[in-house]
């Protein structure tokens, strides 16, 4: 099994990790209650998806 011959410097390690950025999730507004929600998912606030009631949400 292959092993590294030389140690990589911290600057090389950090240059490689420079592209590991985490992106903020895209949010869409629920058409029913106007609360932000993840796209293509049931709204956690009102429980609707594509205009239909999917979840019973306690209010």
Curated annotation (Swiss-Prot):
Keyword Magnesium in record: no
Pfam families cross-referenced by the UniProt entry: Ribosomal_L32p (PF01783)
Cited InterPro entries: Ribosomal_bL32, Ribosomal_bL32_bact, Ribosomal_zn-bd
One Gene Ontology biological process: translation
GO terms assigned for molecular function: structural constituent of ribosome
Keyword tags: Ribonucleoprotein, Ribosomal protein
Domain of life: Bacteria
One Gene Ontology CC term in the entry: cytosolic large ribosomal subunit
Keyword Plastid recorded: no
Sequence similarity: Belongs to the bacterial ribosomal protein bL32 family.
Protein's UniProt name: Large ribosomal subunit protein bL32
């Amino acid at each position: 099994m292959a092993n590294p011959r030389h140690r990589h410097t911290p600057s090389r390690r950090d240059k490689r990790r420079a592209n590991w950025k985490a992106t903020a999730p895209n949010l869409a507004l629920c058409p029913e209650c106007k609360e932000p929600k993840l796209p293509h998912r049931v709204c956690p606030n009102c429980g609707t998806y594509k205009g239909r009631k999917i979840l019973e949400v306690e209010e």
